[in-house]
């Protein structure tokens, strides 16, 4: 054998010797540690109560020994409420308290944390410990879905703890409109890629949690939610305003015969969507969106959770008597608004040929003010502006001649004159302004409207317009008016004579003296320029003042028409609730019905009583004969 072979045989022998020596050392160390542990365990399981040195095999046995032998029970007349462990001397008032205190001295820890495996002596200690885990994050994950080293805590058996429903301090769950709090299972919250869905929020890595649990839901905190909350606040204000109005109407805090008070209260309700169903329809348009944060963009959830539409009841409009009372009050308010002479004349209610055309909404041929469902207007497309949707109806007839295109002037021989109450300039303030006399205009000829030549909104059967002032719905040309006399510098002499001849067809031609307006018939205020504004001096102060006056008149007319719309919508809402029975039965009606039933029962019982008297009847000899 060579020297190399001998060296190779010696090396495995040395390796085996070193391995056996190391294993012996390990066994010796293990035995020493086990002996030390047994000694410590024996010391901890030794009863240290006064005058007792009993040794128990387990902590449970030691605890039972102390409770039964040293603490005792009240039923056996040996109850001891003072701790005798070493020199503790803690005194309690109940047996449960002393037994709970004994757990401090006994190495019994039956309450184990399901996250980290740490054991505790008392359940309240475990509850406090679990809260430290819950404070980290309410969004939990499992190691299978995390895919990294941040896996969930594992028990010694290797099972992943993913359920906290048995823990008292469980803050996890999400709110579902169809049910209550759901305990989660197998959710995700970790360092996964952020999906493309814009509605899901990707948490920062510093807030990551590695605890197993259920899916967490965060409320979206993007800028669109700010606008949504603002819309909720606006709807809440509208709801409060409507409820306050019904309350004031029920308590008669509004003078229904005063147009000023009625106008002031109705202006607060303009623009409020008044629907049916117990209050403001779609008061909550949609609940706050709760979106799951699973780290994958939420591709498997199919969009946000379904929301439910509902409407809130009005506290001041609950019973049937409230509905009837408010309906009568609204009828009085409606008659007050309609009977306002200046307002009705300004809107053309008393004009025989007036018909209304609302731009892009509807077409009506009647003498009543326009009626539209306010909630329908409010539910139009978002790109339609509110001012356009709530624009008032405009009368489409005009007082101009078709042939000449000039204003039709009133013959001075007319016996009808303006009074102080119906003068075009007699009204002031925000109240609607009268532009026509309420007396009969049979002496005036009926002239076709100038808008019939080019307006597509008119039909062939539309009634002809009489002399009067209204505005054309066509934005190409707008005629202002109200004054039936010649404007300064508006027409030359030949055009004036032609217009006079056209306006007095079938009647004797007035003399030149009669055609000249008399000074006493001219209103001593600013007159309206009846010619096309494009042909006049736009920079003159008179034109600017006339435009200001016209804009004030327009605002007054719009306010009056909006008041009519609001009243009609309110009455329609109240009548719908009465017809559908959407109210709470009055207690008075129930009391009256119960009283009627009691009266009927009393009458029936009275009739059922026997006719015979309760006392004996003494008969005489005459009665026998």
Curated annotation (Swiss-Prot):
<dbReference type="GO" id="GO:0003677">
    <property type="term" value="F:DNA binding"/>
</dbReference>
<feature type="compositionally biased region" description="Low complexity">
    <location>
        <begin position="417"/>
        <end position="438"/>
    </location>
</feature>
<feature type="region of interest" description="Disordered">
    <location>
        <begin position="1"/>
        <end position="35"/>
    </location>
</feature>
<feature type="compositionally biased region" description="Polar residues">
    <location>
        <begin position="490"/>
        <end position="514"/>
    </location>
</feature>
<comment type="function">
    <text>Transcription factor that mediates regulation of both acid- and alkaline-expressed genes in response to ambient pH. At alkaline ambient pH, activates transcription of alkaline-expressed genes (including pac1 itself) and represses transcription of acid-expressed genes.</text>
</comment>
<feature type="zinc finger region" description="C2H2-type 2">
    <location>
        <begin position="81"/>
        <end position="105"/>
    </location>
</feature>
<keyword id="KW-0677">Repeat</keyword>
<dbReference type="InterPro" id="IPR050806">
    <property type="entry name" value="pacC/RIM101"/>
</dbReference>
<keyword id="KW-0479">Metal-binding</keyword>
<dbReference type="InterPro" id="IPR013087">
    <property type="entry name" value="Znf_C2H2_type"/>
</dbReference>
<dbReference type="GO" id="GO:0008270">
    <property type="term" value="F:zinc ion binding"/>
</dbReference>
<keyword id="KW-0963">Cytoplasm</keyword>
<dbReference type="GO" id="GO:0005634">
    <property type="term" value="C:nucleus"/>
</dbReference>
<feature type="region of interest" description="Disordered">
    <location>
        <begin position="391"/>
        <end position="440"/>
    </location>
</feature>
<keyword id="KW-0539">Nucleus</keyword>
<dbReference type="GO" id="GO:0005737">
    <property type="term" value="C:cytoplasm"/>
</dbReference>
<feature type="region of interest" description="Disordered">
    <location>
        <begin position="584"/>
        <end position="625"/>
    </location>
</feature>
<dbReference type="GO" id="GO:0045944">
    <property type="term" value="P:positive regulation of transcription by RNA polymerase II"/>
</dbReference>
<feature type="compositionally biased region" description="Polar residues">
    <location>
        <begin position="461"/>
        <end position="472"/>
    </location>
</feature>
<feature type="compositionally biased region" description="Polar residues">
    <location>
        <begin position="391"/>
        <end position="416"/>
    </location>
</feature>
<keyword id="KW-0863">Zinc-finger</keyword>
<feature type="short sequence motif" description="YPX[LI] motif 2">
    <location>
        <begin position="615"/>
        <end position="618"/>
    </location>
</feature>
<feature type="zinc finger region" description="C2H2-type 1">
    <location>
        <begin position="45"/>
        <end position="70"/>
    </location>
</feature>
<keyword id="KW-0678">Repressor</keyword>
<comment type="similarity">
    <text>Belongs to the pacC/RIM101 family.</text>
</comment>
<protein>
    <recommendedName>
        <fullName>pH-response transcription factor pacC/RIM101</fullName>
    </recommendedName>
</protein>
<feature type="region of interest" description="Disordered">
    <location>
        <begin position="455"/>
        <end position="543"/>
    </location>
</feature>
<keyword id="KW-0238">DNA-binding</keyword>
<feature type="short sequence motif" description="YPX[LI] motif 1">
    <location>
        <begin position="444"/>
        <end position="447"/>
    </location>
</feature>
<keyword id="KW-0804">Transcription</keyword>
<feature type="zinc finger region" description="C2H2-type 3">
    <location>
        <begin position="111"/>
        <end position="133"/>
    </location>
</feature>
<keyword id="KW-0010">Activator</keyword>
<dbReference type="InterPro" id="IPR036236">
    <property type="entry name" value="Znf_C2H2_sf"/>
</dbReference>
<keyword id="KW-0862">Zinc</keyword>
<dbReference type="Pfam" id="PF00096">
    <property type="entry name" value="zf-C2H2"/>
</dbReference>
<keyword id="KW-0805">Transcription regulation</keyword>
<feature type="compositionally biased region" description="Low complexity">
    <location>
        <begin position="1"/>
        <end position="34"/>
    </location>
</feature>
